[in-house]
Amino acid sequence: MKRFFSNLFKRKQDQNSHIKQINGPTTSTPTTTPTTPTTPTTTQTPTPQNNNTNNNTNNNNNTNSNNSNQQKKEQAQASPSTNQTQTPSNNTISTSPTVTTQPSFTPGVISTSKLTTSPPESPRPPTSTTNTTQPSTTTTTATNSTNTNTASAPTKTASPSSPSATASPNNNSNNTTTTAATTTTTTTTTTTTNANQTASVNHTSSDQSLNAQNVTQTNNNNNNNNNNNNNNNANNTKPINPNDYIPLDFVDSTPKVDNNQPKRKASGPPEILPEEIDRTDFLGQGSFGSVYKGKCRGQEVAVKIPRKQKLSLYELTSFRHEVKIMSKIFHPNVVLFLGACTQSGKMQIVTELCQTDLEKLLHNDRTKKEFSLFRRMQMAKDAALGMNWLHGITRIVHNDLKTANLLVDINLRVKVTDFGFSQIKEGEEFQDKAAKGTPLWMAPEVMMGNPYNEKADVYSFGIILWEILTKEAPYSHHKDYDIFFNAICNEKERPPIPADTLPSLRHLIQTCWDHNPQNRPSFSEILFRLNEILIDCAIDFDDGRKYWKEHFLVPKQELQEEVEWSDFEKTLKATHKQLNLDYAPLKELLVQQSHQTVQKTKQVVTMERFDKVSKWFGSFFEPNTGIETIDNINKLSAKIWFHGDIVREQATSRLSKAAEGAFLIRLSSTEPKTCPFTLSMKNNQHRRIQLIDENNFTGFKIQGKTAVYNSLIELVEKCNDYPLLVPCPKFTQETFNPYDPYTN
């Protein structure tokens, strides 16, 4: 390299002496050439002040310049061994080192020789929109000595990372000739100009010089915008109109990223940088690690910090593979995986944020009373749906399925979390001994270190079902791990199931935690069993359960927890086989608006409402007794004093507007099976009406009174216990729709 630069400087001196022999001594214009190891060389001279006054002189000199070029061509043919570019100049010569040796060429003549070898590859692809060049061997800037104005504008030789181009301001673009040619080692560009023009000789690769033909760009006074001289483009700046809309300044909140880090791919697992995650509140801690509430890219998220941060190369590769799998799982009952930071020592998992988890709901003294068994079984079904998706799509074994890993969102939908990522999970300690996972929910084969499959998650789900049923923690009496291990793995101990448990639910729990994994059902079968259990939980009567299972539970299909009224009415008509039966009053009692669809006007019959109406009036869906029951509903609905399903506060409000001695009869939701109706009177008096069903006799009486009546209508008409004088009228715009009982 040292010898290369010494030879280069020697050739430069020979070139300068040769120029002096041709043109004689000249006066060089002062030039400032800032040079740094990493920035391009810039040659600057004073900008001409009265450029337009020299246009005529420049045009006259153009002919002489062209003749001079022709003479030089003839001289070059006589001496082809000349190895330097000769250009008359009184200006500064700016040079930069070349990478290759120069073959012989004719001075002043564009080289047309073919490439003998392929040019060197550019380290970066050429960019046509930037004024940058590859490292050029020689850049010569000159002005005609015969011109009276020898000052020229600054000439820039751009950075060595882009295609070659020399920017030179000139208003006389029609007098400019710019050419570029390529050879195996050197490309020479000779430009002949007048007093305000420059001659540039640049070396470019073959691909770059094809795109560099006829390129001469001008620099405006601010040296910011460049226009093409050959197209005569002027520098036009649109004036700012004060009436124009000016947007607010954009404040870039993007974290500053180190450019030395490897670039992230546009596709693949979502890699998140540590500086993009902002942790705020601490949410909890488990076998996975610590969980925080935080923000990532403007979104509220849950941030999980694994305990295990130092991974081997194999573990880190496996972890990144699991991240890729997690990013492809989308299901409403699986917590949405948003991304992960996989840098060793800074590993973090980012997921959607949920409000709470099932463990807190079941064991909190306030919240555990708010959920019926039917609602809790719906939560169990949500968890089974998520696990069935994981087992069926990705073949993922959770290994740590428990109520704490079943998150609950604001809509009380349960979502499975903390699945996968086995490389960064550590065993939760139970007297310092455990495999990966939590021992209380762990299958025996996992605790014993035997091979296991997805049926280990089924065992854990059996413990979860027991916990959902009883709202108690499993194995609370065990404190020692060795005793616990022996009880579960050898003695096959399981939590006690309450005696009043539904037979269908008892059977499912027992099969799920069976000691033999082969006897445990799959989650697909569990879902079907849970559909049956949901019907058993929602409907108390055996004939009602049978009716719903026969008509609205299709094998291998989803359970219809809500049935549109039109479909429900068809099944009733098919059962009763009587065309002139009026179902309108029954519809007012049964129909609710759907909670499962966005379409609020959709009228449906739910399993819970079906059960409640059956308790109030009897089996209206039976082929024989159902017709009589519907007839009784129609007669009762025609009475002015029957107000249907309204609450106590609403009954008091209506009676306050009525005359003295006013009363009404409403449906009771507290004990609909034993006391289906309530007598409400003025002055905030409410008495339950008890159903008498014994010895093949059905009748009614006011609770606390002795008189028994054959029907509710007879009770109202013949009651002597209370002065039922004035029936409280119903409002004309009011219906019995229980979904909106406050309509007045």
Swiss-Prot record:
Residues 641-734 form the SH2 domain. This is Dual specificity protein kinase shkD. Its main location: membrane. It catalyses: L-seryl-[protein] + ATP = O-phospho-L-seryl-[protein] + ADP + H(+); L-threonyl-[protein] + ATP = O-phospho-L-threonyl-[protein] + ADP + H(+). The active site is at D400 (proton acceptor). It is found in: Membrane. It comes from the Eukaryota. ATP binds at L283, G284, Q285, G286, S287, F288, G289, S290, V291, K304. GO terms for cellular component: cytoplasm; membrane. It comes from Dictyostelium discoideum. Residues 277-534 form the Protein kinase domain. SMART domains: S_TKc, SH2. PANTHER family: DUAL SPECIFICITY PROTEIN KINASE SHKD (PTHR44329:SF53), SERINE/THREONINE-PROTEIN KINASE TNNI3K-RELATED (PTHR44329). Keywords: ATP-binding, Kinase, Membrane, Nucleotide-binding, Serine/threonine-protein kinase, Transferase, Tyrosine-protein kinase. Its EC number is 2.7.11.1. Residues 201-210 have a biased composition (Polar residues). Residues 1-276 are annotated as: Disordered.
